[in-house]
């Protein structure tokens, strides 16, 4: 994981330049690549849910250790890495409904889902609804 504290953000969601840069801290943590494992090392596929569970806890722990009360999380590898949205959502939900329940003031999930089925979005909505 990489913590990049107090980085200036120069543009808004539409790509327009902000009048004044906003400061934000970023935690970079790679998602396991289910697709690569399936194609090249299928013996490792059963390890992925535990890796997701453990890494998601590390991300939350690092955020809390640095006093971040508001966090934005993503659909960790549910696109090109082909991670199962239900597994990823449950990895985060297990912590946010358990040990980390009520520890953050605000948690947002940025979930890009342009499919007609909205399977990825629905998986996160279903898993995290109880954490709201």
Predicted feature residues:
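Macrodomain-like recognition of ADP-ribose-binding/processing modules
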Residues: 1-132
């Amino acid at each position: 994981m990489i913590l990049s504290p107090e980085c200036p953000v120069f543009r808004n969601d539409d790509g327009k330049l902000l009048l004044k840069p906003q400061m934000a801290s970023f935690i970079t943590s790679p998602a396991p690549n289910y697709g690569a494992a399936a194609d090249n090392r299928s013996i490792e596929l059963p390890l992925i849910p535990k890796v997701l569970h453990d890494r998601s806890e590390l991300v939350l722990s690092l955020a809390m250790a640095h006093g971040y009360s508001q966090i934005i999380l993503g659909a960790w590898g549910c696109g090109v890495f082909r991670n199962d949205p239900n597994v990823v959502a449950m990895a985060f939900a297990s912590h946010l409904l358990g040990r980390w329940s009520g520890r953050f003031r605000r948690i947002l999930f940025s979930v890009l889902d342009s499919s007609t089925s909205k399977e990825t979005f629905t998986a996160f909505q279903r898993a995290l609804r109880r954490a709201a």
